[in-house]
Regions:
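S-adenosyl-L-methionine
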Residues: 269-311
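C-terminal catalytic and target-recognition region of SAM-dependent MTase-like enzymes
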Residues: 333, 347-409
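Non-catalytic accessory regions of SAM-dependent methyltransferases
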Residues: 1-127
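Conserved class I S-adenosyl-L-methionine
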Residues: 236-245
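Non-catalytic substrate-recognition/targeting regions of SAM-dependent transferases
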Residues: 111-124, 143-219
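Mobile active-site "lid"/loop adjacent to the S-adenosyl-L-methionine
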Residues: 307-337
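Conserved SAM-binding motif I beta-strand of class I
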Residues: 260-265
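Conserved SAM-binding loop of SAM-dependent methyltransferases across substrates and taxa
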Residues: 246-259
Length: 409
């Protein structure tokens, strides 16, 4: 039974109704049959109803985006006060404590946007700092309430939180009519740390994290257990880690007992950080190359280098459907070259972090690359993102990371 509260109402078509009933939280402007008589203020709440007027959910309105409403609740009796949001944060943190190993809680994703019913809000923890990206206008308006609650809930569980840093230098904010910026969020009555750098430990490997200038929030936490899987297989092998970024896979391979590891990246800054991380971990079985992988792999094949384990973890080659075809050509090229470079019996770890490069497309690409390289793929493992980046069924956008381990024969 619906409560007495009153929000503006959007009536949607059958297509949107089916999507919402199936679990997706987004309402696109093109799927709205009837708009409120008076358009609500940007970032405020509205109800969504079916073509027959049945309540479907309540969400934040975005007047600048093609996604007009992002649901936060499907309970018509919810009251969206501070207590509601505190419960949401507590629920998200309790989930992380359940699915992650205790040692991993100091560097983890605390909130994963829609998968935790905080649309457009990723929050990462790096020791005593929370780093956020506010990618929807609803979450932007909620910050004065929500961000202090994030610190309060974790502190109440005995966690040390000294500050919240905002990485809102993200182009997606423009689609919500939001400006780009970065800096400390001012928690009421508190000062923030002077430094925007910290150190984390993951799988026993230490990393320097620059959460002011690093990519995204400063470090990619979603591959933590995939890196561990690579370390387990790397012992005794000669490893090439392409797109190494700050060296995470390479460092895990080296610490896992690889005979030699070469870490390659096109960015000189990334290579410098990877070298710094190697030194911090006392790893001497590593070399570093600042080179484009698309040029590196053909060169190494021509020169006959003896790598028997290759890791491909590129950045997203596509962030839109219209560029998927070109992206798949890029994925095929690097995988084909890696398969050609590897000796028979060598190992390949290959990944894609693009939601639009679906698992079906990725598998099709791998089969094609193997055929052209005259190789067969013996599957060892198929993996996804770590569970602190949960996949919410009904929301395919949360299922983005593909990770395969093969023996190439």
């Amino acid at each position: 039974m619906k409560s007495e509260r009153s929000y503006p109402i959007y009536k949607v078509n059958k297509k949107a109704e089916a999507s919402l009933v199936g679990g997706h939280p987004w309402v696109y402007e093109n799927d709205i049959l009837e708009f409120p008589e008076t358009e609500p203020e940007n970032g405020t709440l509205a109800d969504v109803v079916s073509p027959k007027g049945a309540y479907l959910g309540t969400g934040f309105v975005s007047l600048k985006s093609k996604i007009r409403v992002r649901l936060i609740s499907r309970n018509a009796n919810d009251t969206f006060d501070a207590s509601f949001w505190r419960r949401r944060v507590e629920y998200a943190w309790a989930y992380r404590k359940t699915v992650l190993e205790p040692a991993d809680l100091s560097a983890c994703r605390v909130i994963f946007g829609e998968a935790d019913q905080f649309p457009g809000l990723p929050v990462d923890r790096f020791n005593n700092i929370l780093v956020t990206q506010t990618l929807s206008v609803g979450m932007e308006k909620l910050k004065p309430v929500l961000f202090p609650l994030l610190a309060e809930v974790l502190r109440a569980d005995g966690q040390t939180i000294d500050g919240i840093y905002e990485r809102n230098d993200e182009a997606l904010r423009a689609k919500e009519g939001l400006e780009q910026s970065k800096g400390w969020f001012e928690l009421p009555g508190e000062s923030h740390p002077a430094s925007t750098q910290t150190e984390i430990c993951e799988n026993g490997v230490y990393y320097h994290v620059d959460f002011e200038n690093g990519q995204k929030t400063g470090f990619f936490l979603d591959q933590k257990y995939n890196r561990r899987a690579v370390a387990r297989l790397a012992a005794g092998h000669t490893v090439l880690d392409c797109f190494t970024h700050t060296g995470s896979f390479a460092l895990n391979a080296a610490s896992g007992g690889a005979a030699r590891v070469t870490a390659a990246d096109i960015s000189a800054d990334a290579i410098a950080m990877a070298q710094r991380n190697a030194e911090r971990n006392g790893l001497t079985n590593m070399d570093f190359l600042c080179e484009d992988t698309f040029e590196l792999l053909p060169r190494l094949e021509k020169e006959g280098h003896p790598y028997d384990f290759i890791i491909l973890d590129p950045p997203a080659f596509t962030k839109a459907r219209r560029t998927v075809e070109n992206a798949m050509r890029g994925y095929k090229e690097i995988n084909y070259r890696a398969m050609k470079l590897l000796p028979r019996g060598g190992y390949l770890a290959t990944a894609s972090c693009s939601h639009f490069a679906t698992e079906e497309l990725f598998i099709k690409m791998l089969r094609s690359a193997a055929k052209d390289a005259h190789r067969q793929l013996r599957q060892i493992e198929v993996r996804q993102q770590a569970p602190d980046h949960p996949i919410l069924w009904g929301v395919p956008e949360t299922n983005y990371l593909k990770f395969f381990l093969f023996q190439v024969i």
